[in-house]
Amino acid sequence: MSIGILGKKLGMSQLFDDDGNAVPVTLIEAGPCRVTQLKTQSLDGYTAIQIGYGVSKDKHLSKPEKGHLLKSGKELLKHLKEFKVEENSSYEIGKEITVTNFEVGQKVDISGKSMGRGFSGYQKRHGFSRGPMSHGSKNHRAPGSTGAGTTPGRIYPGKRMAGRYGGKKITTKGLLVVKIDDQKNLLVVKGSVPGKPGSIVNIRPNNTVGNKGGTKS
C-alpha cells in the first residue's frame, strides 16, 4: 500500500501532448519527506505512518517536539502528517519518502488551503448576479431578498451571504500524474491544485473505485 507525501505548490504551467494540445498542469515540489514515527495497534490503537517535511528552525519548536524529531534524524522538520495503513512493517523510522512513490498515469488526491480572499460580497463569494447599474437603480451589488416575512420571521441558517471567502481546506480528487522528475523532486499533475504558490499540499493516492490508485509499497 502506498502512503502519501507532503510537498510545496510551485505554480502552474502547460505541457503539450502527442496531438499538440496544450495541457494545463501544476508543478509540485513533492518531498523528500522523512518517516518520523510508526504507530502500531498495540501501542496507539491504530496503525499509521507519520512523516515530516520542510526544515524548521530550532527556536520554533518546543523541547518535546525537538526530542521527537531528533529520533528520526538530525534535521528538525516543520510539517508533520499521518497516513493510516493496514501494516507498516516495510517502513522504518528515518526512511526517506520521495516522489518515486508515485508513477506516471496514477491518479492522486491533493489537499491544500485555498487562497484567502478576506471578507467578500455576494457576487465575488457566491457568483450572484448584480442589479442594474443605471436608470436610477440603487440596487447594484446588494443581496436582494433574504427570506420571507412574518413566517418564519428569521433568516434560515446556511443562507448564502457576504462573509469570509477562502482560507479553508480543499481537496481536489482524481488528478492525473503526467510527469515525475526524481532529480528535482518534481511532481507534475494535470489541472489545478488548491492554494497559492508556496503553500503546503498533501498528496495521496486516489482510492476511488475504478481509478488507477497507488499500488506501490
From Swiss-Prot:
Sorted alphabetically, the keyword list is: Ribonucleoprotein, Ribosomal protein, RNA-binding, rRNA-binding
> Which Gene3D superfamilies does the record match to this protein?
3.30.160.810, Translation factors (2.40.30.10)
Q: Decide whether keyword Nucleotide-binding is in the record.
A: no
InterPro entries per the UniProt record, alphabetical: Ribosomal_uL3, Ribosomal_uL3_bac/org-type, Ribosomal_uL3_CS, Transl_B-barrel_sf
Q: How does it assemble?
A: Part of the 50S ribosomal subunit. Forms a cluster with proteins L14 and L19.
Annotated family:
Belongs to the universal ribosomal protein uL3 family.
Name recorded for this polypeptide:
Large ribosomal subunit protein uL3
Organism (species):
Prochlorococcus marinus (strain MIT 9515)
Report the gene name: rplC
